[in-house]
Structures are given as C-alpha cells and as structure tokens.
Regions:
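Proline-centered flexible-loop/turn and helix-kink motifs
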Residues: 60, 76, 84, 207, ...
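Glycine-rich beta-alpha loop elements in corrinoid/cobalamin-binding modules
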Residues: 13-126
Length: 439
C-alpha cells in the first residue's frame, strides 16, 4: 500500500512539473526574447535541458547562454555535448564576459573570449573572481512587479542576497563529505560597508521584510560584529549556520534579524562528528538546540548516516538520548551525499560510490559530470538505521504536538514548573522571577 501511495505521489509530482515547464516555455516564448540566460547549478540538468529543448523546438533562433556554479571548462565541454541546444557556456565567475557577449550578440557581432565554451570552441580556462565588492546590488524590479501584478502578498516576499562565496571552515579543512568542488575551494566575502549599503537599497526600493542569505555559512564572529547596523533595517533573515557558535553569537544573530536557519549539526554522536570534521561535539549540538529554541530561531537540520566507515556505536549511542529532546527541533534523517573532490570521494574506490540523480533522464551523462554520490549501504547496519529512523519519527510527532519537557502552571500567584526526567522535580517562581520566565 505504501509503495502504491509513493508511486501515486511521484506521478502527481511529474504531472505538476510538466505543467510548470509548459507555462515557463509559454511565458519565455511570448516575451519574444532574443537571448535566454540560465544559471545552472548542481543537479539542475533535467529541468534545464528539457526547457532548452522545448524552447529551441519552437524558436531555433533563440540564443541560450548558460553560466553558474556548474560551469567549469571541463564540465562545460560535457554539458554542451549533452545539450546541443545551448549556444554559449560562461566559465567566468565575474560579469564582464557576460556583458560583452550579450552586447555583441545583440549587434550580431562575433565575440571571442577564452572563458566561453561554444559548440565550435572550448573555454581555455576558468576566470575566478578575486573580490565581491564590485558586483552591483541585485535588481529584483521585474520579480517585484510580477508579485504586484499577481496580487500576491508583497510583505511575505523573500529576496536572496549573497554576502559570501565558499566556506571559511572548508578553506582550512573541509568536512569529510564536502570537497566544495575542488576549484572553488576558497572563501570570499563582501565588506561590511558594501553589505549594509546593498541591504539598505533593497529595503528602500522594494519595502521587503525578508532576506534569504545564499551563503554556505554565516561569517566569522569578528565580521558579524562589524555589520550590527543591519539590526536597524528591521528585516528578517535566513542564514545557514555552523554549529561552533556560542550564546553571544546566537543573541547577536537574533538581534540582527535571524529568524530561520539551517544548521550543520549532522549528528548527535561525538565520534561521528569527529569523523566528519564538523568542529563540534554531541553535547555542544544539544546545547545549541536549546539556545536556538530559547531565542526563538526556527531551524532545519539533517541527521546523516550511510558513510563508508559507519560504526554501529555512532547510532546506538544516541537512541536513548533522543527521548529527552522531544521539545527541541527534530532533524530530517538523510543518507549522506558525497561531493566530488571530498576526502571520502578521494579515498574511495570507484565501485564504492553511486551517482545521485543525474542519470534519471539522461543516460548519456559520463562520470566527469557527476557531482554528488552515495556510498553503498552496509547491510549489517540496516537494523540500527531503522531504529534511528523510528526514534526520529517519534521525535517529529512529539514536537509537532507541542511536547513539553516540563509542565508549567501559572494559575496561582506565580509559576509552578513540574519536570520529569529520571525523577520528578518541582520549581516555584513568584513576582519578577515569574514574569521573566513567562516573557
């Protein structure tokens, strides 16, 4: 029955995806655009290639330019072979090549550049950006106009903004499963002055309340101290966090406007965290779960399993701990994805890793274009994976029902807290102490 339900859900997703694709093709074609620019990210092939194929089938003169984090010279050669509908691929992290290419195409001129791959010529090298401050403040006017035309709630609109690229932690020694794709293993960040200026401009132009920072990780503590002026904008932010932060950091982030985050806990086993090289421990992760709940910052996080060197004790050690955490944000259980160029990838035999996703519709993909992999599951550990899954499912159910670690009664002159751990305990607060607790 469960398999039939999953199959039905897959069919509905496929149907909806096709309807969305048809609408996108219709809108682009009706715009009578001469050039389509597309930012290709990892795992984005299926939708992008089908979009390009359909657009070219109804307008063979449409020029398609692709750029983005997927576009290295090596991968660009593979991509344009798999999808000949693409005319140009930019292997350039800066905007200069793109601007010159578009201007020349609009004037029907040819343009030769060592950072551009076409069907006739491969890019010779990658142009890596050296700093971010020269990048213009992003223009969302067409998006905002569309929101207004559709009469959607503008006050709920979320706009992305980039403060940094790369991972400062990974620049030193990355997590075991993350290679950040080899050539991009560097960290760049905009100056505090640039960030504050851009955010003020976005706030003034679009009256936005929500920003999603696209950074892989929040900046270091010293940087956050220099952008405290963000607080004055009164906006709400999403930011990805590392787990090696303290209460002072959490308080500062909340004051700045952080209301929602994905945080890289990954596990509640100190041994597993050491293997991953997360720079944290199980007790620190639990402490941060408490802090983030206390400061009313909503979080998502993944509990990872399925490493090639998995140990049974990594998972068994946390099974008895989880019932004490039902009042805190639960994780999603995920089989780990291994990035190309990561420590695990480089230390694994080719037959030990399976590519993720890319070959669902495109069997022609070679290993050179694969980015994400999974290790083969150890059959001897399936029972402990199942136990962990059941525990996390119970955690989610308890949390969604408002599970409380303690019961609070405020129907007398103060607050009475009854807590049940290994024993039953009672706490009484009156006056100012009660008001502080209930704040």
């Amino acid at each position: 029955m469960k398999k039939l339900e999953n199959f039905s859900n897959c069919l509905n997703v496929l149907k909806n995806a096709n309807e969305i694709l048809k609408r996108v093709v219709f809108d682009i074609h009706n715009s009578q655009a001469k050039i389509l620019t597309y930012s290709l990210t990892f795992g984005d092939y299926n939708f992008a290639f089908e979009l390009f194929r359909r657009l070219k089938s109804i307008n063979e003169n449409l020029i398609i330019i692709v750029g983005g984090s997927m576009c290295t010279p090596q991968l660009a050669k593979e991509i344009i072979t798999l999808c000949p509908e693409i005319d140009y691929i930019l292997c350039d992290e800066d905007v200069d090549s793109y601007k010159k290419l578009v201007l020349n195409l609009l004037q029907d001129n040819t343009y030769d550049n060592p950072y551009i791959t076409s069907r006739e010529k491969d890019a010779l090298k990658m142009n890596k950006i050296k700093e971010l401050d020269h990048l213009p403040c992003p223009d969302f006017s067409d998006y905002v106009n569309e929101i207004e035309n559709l009469r959607l709630k503008k006050e709920a609109m979320i706009i992305p903004y980039e403060i940094s690229r790369g991972c400062w932690w990974g620049e030193k020694k990355s997590c075991a499963m993350c290679g950040y794709f080899g050539y991009q293993k560097c960290f760049l960040i905009k100056s505090p002055k640039k960030v504050i200026s851009d955010l003020k401009m976005l706030k003034e132009l679009y009256q936005i309340n929500y920003i999603r920072f696209t950074d892989l990780v929040e900046p270091r503590r010293e940087y956050l101290e220099k952008v405290d002026d963000i607080t004055e904008l009164g906006m709400n932010f999403f930011w990805e966090l590392r787990p090696n932060i303290n209460e002072e950091d959490v308080a500062r982030l909340r004051k700045m406007g952080l209301f929602y985050s994905q945080i890289g806990f990954e596990s509640l086993s100190s041994d597993e965290l050491e293997y991953i090289h997360k720079g944290t421990t199980a007790i620190n992760n639990i402490y941060l779960l408490i802090l983030l709940m206390s400061y009313k910052i909503r979080i998502d996080w993944n509990y990872l399993y399925g490493f090639s060197d998995d140990k049974r004790e990594w998972y068994e050690s946390v099974l008895d701990i989880i019932p004490y955490l039902y009042h805190l944000f639960p994780p999603a259980l995920r089989q780990v994805w291994i990035n190309r160029e990561s420590r695990i990838f480089n230390n694994s035999e080719k037959n030990e890793l399976n590519p993720v996703g890319s070959k669902v519709f495109h069997e022609g993909f070679s290993d050179d274009i694969e980015v994400f992999y999974q290790t083969k599951i150890n059959s001897k550990l399936k029972d402990v994976y199942r136990k962990l899954s059941d525990k996390i499912d119970t955690w989610k159910k308890c949390f969604s029902r408002g599970y409380q670690l303690c019961f609070v009664y405020d129907n007398f002159d103060g607050v009475h807290i009854m807590r049940k751990y290994e024993k039953e305990e009672h706490f009484f607060f009156r006056g100012v102490e009660a008001e502080i607790y209930l704040y």
